[in-house]
Amino acid sequence: MNEMLSRFVNEALSCLIIVPATVLCLLPMKDKMRYSIKNVLPLFLGVLVMVTVIVSGATALLPVEPKVVFYILLVPLFLAYRVIVDADIVKCFATFLLSFTIMSFCKNYAIMIDAVIHPELGTPTFSTDGALIQLGISCAVTAAIAYPVAKYGSHLINGLPYRRVWLISIVMSLMFIGFNFTVQPVHYQTLYLNRVFLVYILITTLMFIMLVLMYTVFYFIASASLKAGKDKEHISVLEMQKKQYDAQQKYLEDTSRIRHDFKHSSLL
């Protein structure tokens, strides 16, 4: 009974990672919110409680892995996200996946610390310490990147309409999520074989740096594409105005010639 309660509490704490993940989802959508935060908060809390209870209860009572249940429950989470933001579904999915990509890196770093504190344990179940550490790392990372995500992310959300560009972002996020879940050790003791722990730290850190660099490059390429589109539109407007100006000039010249001919014929 105590073990079951412990698993329930640990999974409930692990599910709280949804809070910083949701913040990262909403920051770039700050100009696309259908409702105010005051109206969104009850929906968010309701979904959070539902996911927490279902994942924790299923993990404690059934012989299933928590991440399987959690993945299934990402569907209602995404649907709730779609309800509260007014943006293209591809943009929503790209932002949603990027948020959980960052959270998956936070989980890997929490696993490293948990493996030091409790080397006898392993995934997918965190210790209470590990769950709290994961939440702390996730909140710290969210706070650190909140400003650039809100400023530059919203710039792309508001101005970049090209679906293909957002699909590239989705593919990138899926690659990193796949990596993070592939390298997570089933038993922490595996990390203490030879230099596995060091390799785990290095490869996770390198992949996180790669994530930051790739999305930085993605931002500049997308911004350049957006600027090129605006420049092309501006040039089209200028060409249209030039055609109108030329037409008006021709009309004035023709009118002036007609008036001159009429005046000349009247004098005769």
Which sequence ranges carry the predicted segments?
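Membrane-interface micro-motifs in multi-pass membrane enzymes
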Residues: N10-C15, F262
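Juxtamembrane segments at transmembrane-helix boundaries
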Residues: C15, V19-L41, V53-L174, F179-Y188
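Conserved phosphoacceptor histidine of two-component systems
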Residues: E253-L267
